[in-house]
């Protein structure tokens, strides 16, 4: 059954969450999880919404892979939060993710535009 809220929600395309997180962190020195999700949503004009249930497990996997580091800090609102920062390995992975994404988008475009 399709719920009414499903009609207004755009999901992150499969295989792009790492790319979106890495690119968001590449633009900033460090961000906490809420800032990452908020930045993606803001830059996409509200089209892309990263759910907490997807974001934090992805960040944990990225920590394990060595793509990001994390440290505890205090937000502007005086809340305790974990701040994430891109590593050298993360910058390299961002290049890999971008190349794969561009290859897939190019292939999709060719199929759509084929006569």
Task: Walk through the language-model features, giving the residues of each.
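Intrinsically disordered, low-complexity serine/threonine- and proline-rich regulatory segments
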Residues: 1-16, 97
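N-terminal helix-turn-helix DNA-binding core of bacterial DNA-binding proteins
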Residues: 11-54
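Basic amphipathic alpha-helical segments that dock to polyanions
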Residues: 55-62
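Beta-hairpin "wing" of winged helix-turn-helix
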Residues: 63-79, 85
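Amphipathic alpha-helical dimerization/coiled-coil segments
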Residues: 89-115
